[in-house]
Design a protein with these regions (language model features):
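Active-site C-terminal subdomain of aminotransferase-like
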Residues: 1-71, 153
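Alpha-helical context
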Residues: 2-5, 9, 13-16, 20, ...
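Short, well-ordered loop/turn and helix-capping segments at boundaries between secondary-structure elements
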Residues: 16, 20-23, 67, 81-85, ...
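An acidic, carboxylate-rich microenvironment
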Residues: 28, 74, 119-122
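PLP-dependent enzyme catalytic core of the Aspartate aminotransferase-like
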Residues: 36, 97-177
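Conserved PLP-binding catalytic core of the aspartate aminotransferase-like
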Residues: 50-117
Length: 177
């Protein structure tokens, strides 16, 4: 039986992390994460998208999709097929967390791969295009998530955009891989 108390591996991991975050390189990285997030938020808003808090001051962007009549669950699914990882997220005014009206977008992984502000503009375009595709699929397949997913898996347009996203992402290495 293992009881609580200090664990040497946890203490060592914390020491390494504290040393890393105290470097000029980490400060520069952190500033780039926030700059990328702000650029992504501004690019989405410039395309007419609504964000929670009208922007961001940190590494996250909360995108309110309710104006489009599609749920965060559906956008999460379509983006996943396109090789873009997001999280569905409830937004203020949602009636149920099962069908959230938003998507949470983060920039740390993108920044770690070497993406900068110019790349956030391209990503914003991918995101906005995905909503149009989702609306078209929902119109053809119906509002139920299971029907949407079936329609999504049959969409050649979605597959083509997934290939476009993959080609874009291949420009950037994945650290440690």
């Amino acid at each position: 039986m293992h009881q609580g108390g200090p664990h040497n591996v946890s203490i060592a991991a914390l020491a390494v992390q504290l040393k890393e975050v105290n470097t000029p390189e980490f400060k520069k990285y952190s500033e780039q994460v926030v700059s990328n997030s702000k650029t992504l938020a501004n690019a989405l808003m410039a395309k007419g998208e609504k964000l929670i808090c009208s922007g961001t001051i940190n590494h996250l962007v909360m995108w309110d999709l309710r104006q489009h009549g599609v749920t965060g669950s559906k956008i999460e699914k379509i983006l996943d097929v396109m090789h873009i990882t997001t999280n569905k997220n409830s937004v203020v005014g949602d009636k149920s967390a099962v069908n959230p009206g938003g998507i949470r977008l983060g920039t740390p992984a993108l920044t770690t791969r070497g993406m900068t502000e110019e790349h956030m503009e391209i990503i914003a375009d991918f995101l906005v295009r995905s909503v149009k595709m989702a609306k078209d699929i929902q119109e053809k397949s119906g509002k139920k998530l299971v029907d949407f997913v079936a329609g999504l898996n049959e969409s050649e347009e979605v597959k083509a955009m997934g290939e476009e996203v993959t080609a874009f992402a291949k420009q950037f290495s994945i650290p440690g891989v």
